[in-house]
Amino acid sequence: DDRLMLGAMGSSKVYMTKFDKYSDLFAEQGDMDTPAVFGVGLGYKLTPKLTTALDITYTMYEDVKSIGNAPPTIGPGQIYPISQAANATGKDDGLGFGWENQTVFKFGLAYDMSDKVVLRTGWNYGKSPIPSDNGALLFNILAPATTQNHFTMGATYRTNPTTEWSFMYMYAFGYYQS
């Protein structure tokens, strides 16, 4: 069936140059690699002008020490014990943001209004990778990524067979984690 489209993608961990200015903050003396991401996608042409798509991706945050290592261990009512060796930043197995691996679901629609104009909309959901326990929220003030739902819309305008202009808008819904 030529209306059905399947795809798969993958990106291995990208080893980045260390952040020298943050060597005392990020685990492994400033190392902040980009995690591996894998995914599958399905598209289906519902009509000659309307296509729907579903993507599922999996990001391996736990394999990057500065992102996946455990955050500070503190109990209720305790003050952050920065002086304890177990809570040291910048060390080989130093503190991380404590992020868990994340599965993200994306759903989208594309409508071909004409040979020149395509309209798009989509929804993205990924449970926050930040655990709500044991000091992770406090430590993640440095990297706030708690939005779970995103809505997108966009359009492409083809001015000629070799040139097109694309525009998009994204709205990230508020998400409060405690």
Language-model region placement:
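Outer-membrane beta-barrel porins/channels
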Residues: 1-178
